[in-house]
């Protein structure tokens, strides 16, 4: 029983150390692995056509456009 507690504590300490030493991009990646995701859209790093922008980003050739309904922007295909 003591070994299991020690092993768990060691695992937690190592995980926290990695988070402290990691740069911002790695922290975001690790936090996404650690935290359970509530919605499938949160798993994406960019917005898809007709969906809200994710951190101001849209997938592919889509553009983040601020509209009346979406103050933070919605991803739309823009004609060249």
From Swiss-Prot:
**Spans through the membrane:** none
Keyword Nucleotide-binding attributed? no
Kindly report the protein's main subcellular placement as a broad class.
secreted
Q: What's in the keyword line of the UniProt record?
A: Disulfide bond, Knottin, Pyrrolidone carboxylic acid, Secreted, Signal
Cystine pairs annotated here are: 46-59, 53-64, 58-75
Provide the propeptide boundaries. 23-43
- Which residue positions does Pyrrolidone carboxylic acid occur at? 44
Where does it live in the cell? Answer: Secreted
**Name by which UniProt lists this protein:** U10-hexatoxin-Mg1a
Q: How is it modified after translation?
A: Contains 3 disulfide bonds.
Q: What is the lineage of its organism?
A: Eukaryota, Metazoa, Ecdysozoa, Arthropoda, Chelicerata
Question: What cellular-component terms does GO give this entry?
Answer: extracellular region
Q: What does this protein do?
A: Inhibits Kv11.1/KCNH2/ERG1, Kv1.1/KCNA1, Kv1.2/KCNA2 voltage-gated potassium channels and Nav1.7/SCN9A voltage-gated sodium channels. In vivo, no toxicity is observed upon intracranial injection into mice and intrathorax injection into crickets.
Signal peptide from the UniProt entry? 1-22
Domain free text: The presence of a 'disulfide through disulfide knot' structurally defines this protein as a knottin.
